[in-house]
């Protein structure tokens, strides 16, 4: 007599991460903004680093994994969309949230970013709770 096939195991849900395990990279050419975001996110318990250009972000992403990247759209040199595409090649698995001061004027840029896989878009000026809410929506965590 043949054996009964084993039932497939139910897929395991990923354990929620602790805030202290979530790595965040903030990329913006406005140094005051990146420093303020780093200070605020670190105070919330997230491991946070900054980069002030797309090139610097790519270098950091090749050296370390980031769970989430907050990326400014309008930067000199490599802009946010170019950086996003290259980040996808250099560091797949990082969720990207675009930050833009363009508001509604460049709807096409926002639509292109979303079509490429950007998880969310946040308009400047923003409140820190918009940033922390984006993190919670993208990466569920325990605390």
Regions inferred by a protein language model and the residue ranges of each:
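Alpha4 helix (beta4-alpha4-beta5 surface) of REC/receiver domains from two-component response regulators
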Residues: 82, 103-122, 133
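Active-site beta3 strand of CheY-like receiver
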Residues: 65-70
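Receiver (REC) domain active-site loop signature in two-component systems and cognate sites
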Residues: 75
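Conserved phosphotransfer cores of two-component systems
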Residues: 62-64, 87-94, 116
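Hydrophobic/aromatic residues positioned on beta-strands within the core alpha/beta folds
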Residues: 99-101
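Acidic catalytic/metal-coordinating carboxylates
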Residues: 52-56, 79-83
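Two-component/phosphorelay signaling modules centered on CheY-like receiver
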Residues: 31-49, 116
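Non-catalytic signal-transmission and effector/linker regions of two-component phosphorelay proteins
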Residues: 1-23, 129-143
């Amino acid at each position: 007599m043949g054996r009964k096939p084993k039932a497939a195991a139910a897929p395991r849900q990923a354990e929620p991460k602790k805030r202290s395990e979530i790595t965040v990279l903030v990329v913006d050419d406005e140094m005051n903004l990146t420093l303020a975001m780093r200070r605020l996110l670190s105070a919330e318990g997230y491991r946070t680093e900054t980069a002030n250009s797309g090139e610097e972000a790519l270098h950091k992403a090749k050296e370390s994994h980031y769970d989430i990247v907050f990326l400014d759209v309008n930067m000199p040199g490599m802009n946010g969309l170019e950086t996003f595409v290259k980040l996808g090649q250099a560091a797949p698995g990082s969720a990207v949230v675009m930050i833009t001061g363009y508001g509604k004027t460049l709807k096409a840029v926002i639509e292109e970013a979303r079509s490429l896989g950007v998880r969310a878009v946040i308009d400047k000026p923003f409140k820190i709770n918009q940033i922390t809410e984006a993190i919670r929506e993208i990466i569920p965590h325990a605390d």
